[in-house]
Structures are given as C-alpha cells and as structure tokens.
C-alpha cells in the first residue's frame, strides 16, 4: 500500500469526520425548559445535570414557572444562581469537550412565567416574559423541532398557545404547532389537560396526573 494512498485515505477519513461533526452540530435539538425551581430541590439538581450536557443541545430558554407545589411565585433568580455556578467551571468543562455555552449567553435565556397557578394564568392579558419568549423562538426560521421540557406547571406554554391561536391564521397555527415537541412526566397544574383538549394534534408526551385526565 503506497504512502500516497494512505495519505489520501487519511484525508478522506478526516473530511468525513469533520462533516460528521458539522452535521452533529447542525442537528442539535432545540430545547426550552419550564421549571418550578424552588418548589423542592430536584429541579435545581436537574438544572445542574442539564448544564453539564449543555454542549449536546441547543438551549433556547430557561423559564421559571409555577406548579401545584409552587402556586403563586416564580424564581428566575434561582436559575441564574445555578448558571453563575456553572460559569465558574465553564473553562474546565471546555477543556474536555467543545461547545459549552458561556455563562452570559445562558443568563440571557432566563425568563419568568406568570406567577399564577394553572389556568388562572391563561387567557386575555395573561402574557408573560416566558410565554412571549416561547412564541419568539417558535417563530424563528429554523426547521428543527422545538422541544419543551416541562419540570413543573405548563401554563406558560398554555398561554403561548392561547395567544398564537388568537393572533395567527389557522394555517400559521397548524405550522407552529407542528414544530413543537412537549415532554412532561406528569401534570402539575390544570393547564396540561387544557392544552391537550384544545390542541389535539400537538406532540405531547405525558403520564397524566391523578387529578387530570
């Protein structure tokens, strides 16, 4: 086997490998997190784990919400606290693998949902920084699905969908809904069933809570 052949083979391998890396970068899943952080310790723990893998996904939002355990307050400052701790180890994480977002970039993704429980926070004049942010990201010219990972209540998403349905054409609503992927382990307020009843075509993974069908 000639030296030239080996060099060409190595070049093709490197070219394939670089293309593979570029494709992997392009195909990162977009995700917005809804969290009732401070309801109990688990969401803080989950956020720490998420940031350790934040180079593997394209984070688009970190939204503080209410839930059945956290009915009338949201805590974006607690999300920011975890991000600032992440900022202290960002350089070390980046030594091991590329692509970890910077602290400042993540802080810009922190938003607040309405500090009301469930459907009390859905309807006319119930828009929040968080619900408007979901719409903004959903309207971006990006063909990748937008995953909504729900760790608490889902009324911030419900309000975004309520507004979309009221300001968009039927075709626009259908196209935006088709881009959404919702994953929540259970219902933590009554807005989840409202979403499923009013948007039956929405991709929505859930084990319904005890109080909601």
Annotate each PLM feature.
Residues 1-5:
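Positively charged n-region of N-terminal signal peptides that target proteins for export
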Residues 8-19:
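Bacterial N-terminal signal peptides
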Residues 23-213:
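N-terminal acidic, glycine/proline-rich low-complexity segments
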